[in-house]
A protein has these predicted regions:
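Solvent-exposed loop/turn segments flanking beta-strands in beta-repeat/beta-sandwich domains
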Residues: 74-86
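Short beta-strand edge segments in extracellular beta-sheet folds
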Residues: 140-145
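Extracellular and select intracellular beta-sandwich modules with Ser/Thr-enriched
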Residues: 134-139
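N-terminal signal peptide c-region/cleavage motif recognized by signal peptidases
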Residues: 15-18
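Conserved structural position at the C-terminal beta-strand
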Residues: 125-127
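Short, compositionally biased P/S/T/A/G/V-rich stretches that sit at domain boundaries
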Residues: 21-65, 72
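Aromatic sugar-binding surface patches on proteins
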Residues: 101-110
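Surface-exposed, short loops/turns at beta-strand junctions within beta-sandwich domains
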Residues: 113-120
């Protein structure tokens, strides 16, 4: 009887789903040279508000990270989730949008357990509302080992 119980427990452990991190940025992409030029966002915009929720700005975190961005339309506008574009600011630019498609909604981006190599990673998020008003926001993720 003891053997059957141990066998059952062992088989459950073996088939239990593993919690794996999904790759947001590869080590090869992180090794690319940084994009040249000034990375700035406009101060005044009628476009949607874009705010980094997680990880907190100016905070070092270890991978995997929960990458969360909040969108908020201004006035009566509605966010167009199909307009969202996420770019890793390297030379050449790396479009991260396809990796995040399932995590993008009108409320924002919610990508749990994102695998990101150590280093400083600059990401630009572009979003438009239904009226075509656009906002570009640039965030830097600081990831430690």
């Amino acid at each position: 009887m003891k053997f059957i119980q141990l066998s059952l427990i062992a088989s459950l452990i073996m088939v239990a789903p593993a919690v794996n991190a999904a790759q947001l940025i590869s080590a090869k992409e992180a090794a690319l040279p940084s994009a040249s030029g000034t990375l700035a966002t406009r101060g005044i915009s009628r476009g949607p508000s874009v705010k980094l929720v997680s990880p907190e700005a100016d905070t070092s975190v270890s991978s995997p990270i929960d990458f969360k961005v909040h969108f908020e339309a201004r006035g009566e506008g509605k966010i167009d989730p199909n307009s969202v574009k996420v770019v890793y600011m390297k030379s050449p630019f790396v479009d991260l949008t396809p990796r995040l498609k399932g995590a993008i909604s009108p409320q924002g981006i919610d990508f749990a357990k994102a695998d990101v190599p150590p280093g400083s990673h600059t990401i630009r998020v572009t979003v438009k509302d239904a009226d075509g008003r656009e906002t570009n926001s640039v965030f830097t993720l600081n990831v430690t080992k």
